[in-house]
């Protein structure tokens, strides 16, 4: 390493782009403020924020400064998920789908839910979690008459891994994606954004994913259905 800096701001000087990795705080979004204000293309590791409102604020800054900005799960870009998206028309209309993974609801559930978004697109409006603190079973309702069941179990409950199931009017499909080189595909998508301006994952969509996860978490705490608008407006 030729240059060692003392602050994140110094690290973002005289560079072509900024990569912000997950520091375990769930608040790495705060390191994006400086490069975004300087107009430096920025990638922020998932989850952009634990709270949807914080994610929305940094997303608004990216739009206001017109700076290329990306935050996304690497599972959006693995070949198996890309191929599933291509095969979607063969399955007919999808009104029911499931996604599952092990570990924490937000930190790892974002990968499972991102597979759903990569294949079926956005549109979540509410979540109802009928699971337990260590075994989440969240029904996420979408505005296009689609329901997605997101199952995320802590390590004591299930092993790590990812799976997506689509139940269409013409056929069903189950995919357990191959995760080989998954970070390579993610970085390729970011470089494409830097070079061409092509947004593979609009920041508004990533904010919605975080809002759906937060709504799922709050639903379990409150014992009721929680809308995405509720978490986005929370103080």
Where are these regions (language model features)?
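Beta-loop-alpha module in the N-terminal Rossmann-like domain of NAD(P)-dependent dehydrogenases
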Residues: 2-60
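C-terminal helix-rich "cap/oligomerization" subdomain common to oxidoreductases
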Residues: 10, 14-22, 193-235
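A general structural signal for well-ordered alpha-helical segments in protein cores
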Residues: 28, 55, 81, 112-113, ...
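Generic hydrophobic alpha-helical segments
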Residues: 32, 84, 189-190, 216
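A contiguous active-site-proximal alpha/beta segment in oxidoreductase catalytic domains
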Residues: 43, 48-107
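Rossmann-like dinucleotide-binding domain that binds NAD(P)(H)
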Residues: 95-159, 204-211
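C-terminal substrate-binding/catalytic lobe of Rossmann-fold NAD(P)-dependent oxidoreductases
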Residues: 134-190
């Amino acid at each position: 390493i030729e240059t060692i800096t003392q602050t994140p701001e110094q690290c973002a000087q005289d560079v072509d782009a900024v990569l912000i990795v997950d520091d375990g705080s769930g608040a790495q979004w705060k390191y994006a403020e400086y490069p975004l204000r300087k107009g430096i293309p920025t990638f922020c590791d998932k989850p952009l924020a634990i709270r949807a409102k914080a994610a929305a604020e940094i997303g608004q800054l990216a739009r206001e400064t017109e700076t290329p900005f990306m935050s996304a799960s690497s599972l959006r870009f693995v070949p198996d998920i890309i191929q599933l998206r291509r095969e979607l028309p063969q399955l007919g209309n999808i009104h029911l789908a499931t996604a599952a993974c092990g570990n924490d609801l937000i930190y790892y559930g974002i990968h499972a839910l991102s597979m759903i978004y990569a294949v079926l697109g956005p549109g979540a409006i509410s979540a109802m979690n009928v699971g337990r603190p260590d075994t989440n079973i969240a029904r996420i309702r979408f505005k296009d008459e689609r329901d997605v069941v997101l199952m995320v179990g802590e390590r004591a409950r299930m092993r790590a891994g990812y799976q997506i199931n689509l139940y269409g009017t013409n056929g069903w499909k189950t995919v357990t994606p191959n995760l080989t080189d998954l970070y390579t595909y993610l970085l390729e998508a970011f470089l494409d954004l830097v070079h061409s301006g092509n947004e593979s994952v609009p920041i508004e969509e990533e904010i919605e994913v975080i809002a759906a996860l937060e709504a799922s978490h709050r639903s379990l705490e409150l014992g009721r259905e929680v809308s995405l608008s509720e978490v986005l407006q929370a103080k």
